[in-house]
Amino acid sequence: MSLLAIGINHHTASVDLREKVAFGPDKLANALQQLSQHEAVNGSVILSTCNRTEVYCDVKSGARSKVIDWLSQFHQIGLEELKPSLYVYEEQAAIRHLMRVSCGLDSLVLGEPQILGQVKQAYSDSREQQAVDASLEKLFQKTFSVAKRVRTETDIGGNAVSVAYAACTLAKHIFESLEKSTVLLVGAGETIELVAKHLHANGCSKMIVANRTRERALTLAEQFDAQVISLQEIPNHLAKADIVISSTASPLPIIGKGMVETALKQRRHQPMLLVDIAVPRDVEAQVGDLNDAYLYTVDDLQSIIDSNIEQRKVEAIQAEAIVAEESAAFMSWLRSLQAVDSIREYRQSANEIREDLLSKALLSLESGSDPEKVLRELSNRLTNKLIHAPTRALQLAAEQGEPAKLTVIRQSLGLDELK
């Protein structure tokens, strides 16, 4: 029983190679079935995302090259192309790597939480194919508890490191409750969709989506029960907005100083937060000069993100310490299991020898042999049988010039205690 992790990721391989080595839904089941039938593999879990492909296995001794060969053959990629980008971890290093990955310590965005869900899905997919053996079952369950511990004891995922999330975090800091706030979203692209998801997750239920094309805005609005307006209608609705978040591809500003000034008068100068994450700007810079208007640009958000990344790096130090501690503890537990198996096998072998010699001795007694002679012969044979393997091990260690091994065997047999 030996743990093995092989893979490629965004650190080691180009997008082109990662695409070639990915296990899509159409390939995954077949791959797990092949690994289950592989002579060198006891169990396997395959993790395949846009940034990494990794195969975790419980393997027989010396299976490293066989699993690499299998990966090469399965994807029909030459070893000369695959190997330079491939990393291989064994035993405790494999345990530590899986735990680091699951905690977001090896992610493109440090501390991102999505990877844990992807690892859980990979484990679930492998269980569906009955590819997870007892060792991997224990490893993945332990990994999930370690990831939970890292999230609980550190703040590695608590600081915004995406523009969309940073915009929502800023809004939460300025307004006491997003549940009571009305948000105007200008644009309906990917960034605004992410913003809407974060806002919705934080209790915001009053959203207005303004976009050039109504169809795209409707698609977004349906997800969050939002109102849809055109860009031309923004002046009529701006006064309703406590928060404005804008991200379009417009070459010219959409929201001007005069428009905001009018809206603030209608709001009786209740504060308005405007977050402009478009390049070029959607909101005129002069809006920031108005009292009660708080304008933040993508550059302002980037400084927040940079600061948060540094904070995550600090939190990662503690997370790494937790992973080191937990991976070492799991490896110790795994080794203790291996010792239990060895002890069981050794005891079984000794019992088989005893039963065999006892049967022969009883037959001799039944045939009328001298009991004393039978007992002496039994004790001699039992001694010779039981010391044969240790004696041979001592001889080999001495012949091969391995004093350290010789010392270990002597200690195991308790010979030094007899002096």
Curated annotation (Swiss-Prot):
Pathway the protein acts in: Porphyrin-containing compound metabolism; protoporphyrin-IX biosynthesis; 5-aminolevulinate from L-glutamyl-tRNA(Glu): step 1/2
PANTHER family: GLUTAMYL-TRNA REDUCTASE
GO molecular function term, any single one: glutamyl-tRNA reductase activity
Family: Belongs to the glutamyl-tRNA reductase family.
One of the protein's GO biological processes: protoporphyrinogen IX biosynthetic process from glutamate
Alphabetical list of PROSITE patterns matching this protein: GLUTR
Organism encoding this protein: Vibrio vulnificus (strain CMCP6)
UniProt xrefs under NCBIfam families: hemA
Protein role: Catalyzes the NADPH-dependent reduction of glutamyl-tRNA(Glu) to glutamate 1-semialdehyde (GSA).
Site (Important for activity): H97
Record remark on domains: Possesses an unusual extended V-shaped dimeric structure with each monomer consisting of three distinct domains arranged along a curved 'spinal' alpha-helix. The N-terminal catalytic domain specifically recognizes the glutamate moiety of the substrate. The second domain is the NADPH-binding domain, and the third C-terminal domain is responsible for dimerization.
Protein's recorded name: Glutamyl-tRNA reductase
Binding residue positions for NADP(+): G187, A188, G189, E190, T191, I192
Catalytic activity as recorded in UniProt: (S)-4-amino-5-oxopentanoate + tRNA(Glu) + NADP(+) = L-glutamyl-tRNA(Glu) + NADPH + H(+)
Sites where the protein binds substrate: T49, C50, N51, R52, S107, E112, P113, Q114, Q118
E.C. code: 1.2.1.70
Description of how the protein assembles with itself and partners: Homodimer.
Coiled-coil features, chain-numbered ranges: none
CDD domains, per the entry: NAD_bind_Glutamyl_tRNA_reduct
Residue ranges of the TM segments: none
Residues at the active site: C50 (nucleophile)
